[in-house]
Amino acid sequence: DPQTVAILKEAGIPVLRAELDSSAQGNIPNILLMGYVLGREDAAISLVNEIEDRLDFLSKKIPNTNQKRVLSITKWATIFAAGSNSTEGGIIEQAGAINAAAEVGINEHKEISIESIAEINPDVILLPQPRKGAEEFQKELLNHPVLLEVPAIKNQKIFYVHVPSAWVG
């Protein structure tokens, strides 16, 4: 928000805006930048090394055979799917699965319909949103006639993913 930036600068508070990247490794440059700005380069480098080590460990441990097609969706007023260039998509791929939304051409977060979920036909569905909304959405998905033959619905492979409240306001 340009007005907020102007107020902060006017008050003598330095303002730094980092590029937001939603991939699994995309915020590493931001961590290094913040370490530099805060005079904590060693801590930033240590954190980056830990992140890279963990990602490397995961990629070596997860076989690329029998990859599940995973769809990450949320429902607020409407349904949104996390495609390529999304945090959820990066996590799905890092875990050795296929981001089903990205596979059908969805980029970032896009609004989709119940019918689109049926067309995407995922093996697994993730619901990264507050528990109350996720539970209601899960019931809706499990009981929707259009989705009865979708593998994730048929096999009840719908999972709530805890979202820290700071993410949702």
Question: Model-predicted segments: where are they?
Answer:
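Acidic/His-rich segments in extracytoplasmic proteins that coordinate ligands and/or metal ions
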Residues: D1-V37, E111-E149
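Extracytoplasmic substrate-binding proteins
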Residues: Q3-A77, A101-A102, Q156-G169
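Internal, well-ordered alpha-helical scaffold/interface segments
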Residues: L32, N49, L71, S86-E93, ...
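Short secondary-structure boundary/capping segments
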Residues: I62, G89, E149-P151
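Histidine- and/or cysteine-centered catalytic micro-motif in compact active-site loops
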Residues: I73-A77, V104-G105, P122, P130-R131
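Alpha-helical, coiled-coil/dimerization segments enriched in small aliphatic residues
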Residues: A81-H109
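Short glycine/proline-rich, acidic loop/turn segments that cap or connect secondary-structure elements
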Residues: H144-Y160
